[in-house]
């Protein structure tokens, strides 16, 4: 059985549809940075997804070639995720999608080193004849957060976010979105193949203890 991060780390990928507090450890990701409306067919966000998966599957299938990764085991590619922010906005304003900045990411298994990642970028560039220069090895220590499973349209997330913020406040926390701590979404459904009303998205916000 291939290792499935969603099943093995349910506390990060499969929270309930009610808010909870979680401490997220440092993880490494394949990442692409960009800006603009994520719904634009020819925009930077849609392009980033193809780049991420190009590297993700090059690493996943590496065991079939000459590049052997130390400690490799078969695994399911983790879900697509995104860190989002807007300049001059506290939190997220869903009515101003064209002002989004993002870091689009896919988690890397812990056994993948920076050297393995660099090999994958070179290999994917050679095989796919595509420019992967925007792809980066991104380490991020997210820390303490409030999160919730959001079911439905992305545009309806504000109701879930409000519930999360209320929960955090009731438990002695305050939201801590900053220049280095972001609105975070983990996409468990493919919007091309799933009814909008059934889309599953983990929504996560950084928090810190309230100073009394």
Q: Model regions: which residues?
A:
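A solvent-exposed interaction/effector surface
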Residues: 1-212
